[in-house]
Amino acid sequence: VARQLLGNLDDLNEARVAFLLPAGFDYVAVQWGIWRAGGIAVPLCDKHPLPSIRYVLDDTNAAILVYSGTFDALLAPLADRDGLRLIRLEEMTVTQQTGALPQVDARRRAMILYTSGTTGRPKGVVTTHANLSAQVLSLVEAWKWVPGDYIVNVLPLHHVHGIVNVLCCALWSGACCEFLPKFDADEVFDRFGRGNITLFMAVPTIYHKLIARWNELDEAGKSALTHALSGLRLMVSGSAALPVRVLEEWQTVSGHTLLERYGMTEIGMAISNPYDGERRPGCIGQPLPSVQVRLAGENSEPVHGDSPGEIQVKGPTVFLEYWGNPAATSEAFTEDGWFRTGDLAVVENGSYRILGRNSVDIIKSGGYKLSALEIEEVLRTHPAVRDCAVVGIPDDTWGERVVAGLVVGGPVETDELSRWLRGQLPDYKTPRHYLFLDELPRNEMGKVTKKELKKMFTDQKPSEQ
């Protein structure tokens, strides 16, 4: 793969190489081939519509796009795109070329993953090879990965959770990683029943769905599954807060106390409950190896004792920069080099507990961190929408459910609006409820008061999708 990407070049020299491939061996071969050729890997989500894909290609100025023929129809409009070399996976050939591949310094940029922020549009998070190595080594040590481990992956591979926590840790350790093409509770239970799985990692939404399916089984089925789950050594939850009820119900299903951890695209994993030791409900544990964590006040002054503060992180796991956005990069760090996560926490009996998010414009739904501002920006392009505001409201399954308050200029069918939105945004960013209003709630400065909008959703019955 590396030689095919290089062509006549000696080194890709951090050229951005996007790839759109189903989870499996080909995904791994292309990702690592990009790195071996000296390129920057830009994984795309196989469930995103073309506008989302085009945005990433534009923002990174990608030189190459490697894709599976499965996506021929989706990517057809890119065929004549200037400056983009399209490589169809099925047309790649095994090369007989020999010779040295480039030496890639650990300080080079390795990957760009996209994450939503309060500026609205997704930002490209750049990690170096050294960053990725530090992230993986920290987890391998803390969670005691060994060559005999076997993990089944149900997580998306355009996200740090699936790429680093599962795939890279497994490869680094010499363990086995099996991919499921999509999440299906019965398929997951079938893999558990085979008896070779040692680890499993998922978002709270997946555990919620597994619990719901387990409750539908007869007593013999429940007993067999619980016995199979007892053979796993570790089960991890992350990417969103783990509801205590889900943790307790999963204990009943599996006999396991889920290990909850805390991380972000920008920092990898930073805090984790212990592999050995007490895992307290509602808490995320202690800093991982090589990670420095502090709580800080509004002016980034350290706070102590049981006072709440913003989680700030420093260390080799922390990303290099936001791609092409030096202003956002500068704003993300304190003057003394700590990354501002925007999450508030307290330390209780030596363990961190998350209190919430500094910004109401960040929604955590189903393991994704979504920007309300990005969704609003797209909604406002619909001809019938005069104004809008998007918020997240608590939901047992998703953590937070995306909802929208709308001011419209005439009759609007919510089904039609949702269909239109799904052509512009990934499905998981599409609001599940709409509230039609004469005007949005605002303060005296004219700013939308999103806390009041959230309350309106609890007081009224909105239209549901």
For each feature predicted by the language model, list its residue ranges.
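Conserved AMP-binding/adenylation subdomain of ANL enzymes
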Residues: 133-150, 160-199, 209, 213-217, ...
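Conserved pre-ATP/AMP-binding loop-to-beta segment of ANL
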Residues: 96-114, 120-121, 144-150
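Conserved AMP-binding/adenylate-forming
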Residues: 2-48
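Gly/Ser/Thr-rich phosphate-binding loop
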Residues: 143, 197-202, 212-280, 292, ...
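Conserved ATP-dependent adenylate/AMP-binding module captured primarily in the ANL superfamily
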Residues: 4, 48-77, 95-96, 135-152, ...
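AMP-binding/adenylate-forming catalytic core of the ANL superfamily
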Residues: 3, 315, 320-321, 344-429, ...
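Conserved ATP/PPi-binding loop(s) of AMP-dependent carboxylate-activating enzymes
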Residues: 286-290, 299-332, 351, 370
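Conserved AMP-binding A3 loop
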Residues: 110-137
